[in-house]
Amino acid sequence: MQDITMEARLAELESRLAFQEITIEELNLTVTAHEMEMAKLRNHLRLLTEKLKASQPSNIASQAEETPPPHY
């Protein structure tokens, strides 16, 4: 009887391990896909930021254009 119980427990553990391996592989694929999507989104955000900066002139004057403070 002890052998049957041990064999049943071993079979259950092997089954759980197999399902865990499948789950880990699926999660790995999901994480990899998300990393690739995030890289694309970062690049897109960088390009949009550059376009926005290029299209809007700055309202802040450069140092050369600034008038000196009144105490000079």
UniProtKB/Swiss-Prot annotation:
Region: Disordered, residue numbers: 53-72
Gene3D superfamilies: 1.20.5.300
Domain of life where this protein originates: Bacteria
Disulphide-bridged cysteine pairs: none
InterPro entries: SlyX
Ranges of biased composition (kind: Polar residues): 55-65
Similarity comment text for this entry: Belongs to the SlyX family.
Name of the protein in its database record: Protein SlyX
Gene that this sequence comes from: slyX
